[in-house]
Amino acid sequence: MKRLYNFLSSYEKRKLRNRAKLDKSAGRLRISIFKSNKHFYVQLINDAKGTTLASASTLDDKIRNVCKGRVNAETIKQVSSLLIERLPSTKLQQRFVFDRGAYKYTGLISQFAEALRSSGFKF
């Protein structure tokens, strides 16, 4: 594994490091993020059962008209509120794991995390 690690890009190395840290916190629900230049996707995943409890993205009908193909702070707040709206209220009291993938914790990722924390998420 160590030899293969040397041939990976810095993006892939960061992704592997973050995934290894997430494995240590098994038993919690995971908030997974994917972003592109045009869209932002979020899922709340139960890894023990292998199911997705709730999801939200800028492709949803409620947000698509506001987003207009660009991801900014306003659309991030709307995606977080949509995720909270779709989540059962009993699940909101649990602790979560924030899976940022290979993305650095700056910009839109940190704004999304702060929006969730202000709504009552604990991670």
Swiss-Prot record:
Keywords: Ribonucleoprotein, Ribosomal protein, RNA-binding, rRNA-binding. Gene3D superfamilies: 3.30.420.100. It holds the Pfam family Ribosomal_L18p. GO terms for cellular component: cytosolic large ribosomal subunit. Signal peptide: none annotated. This is one of the proteins that bind and probably mediate the attachment of the 5S RNA into the large ribosomal subunit, where it forms part of the central protuberance. This is Large ribosomal subunit protein uL18.
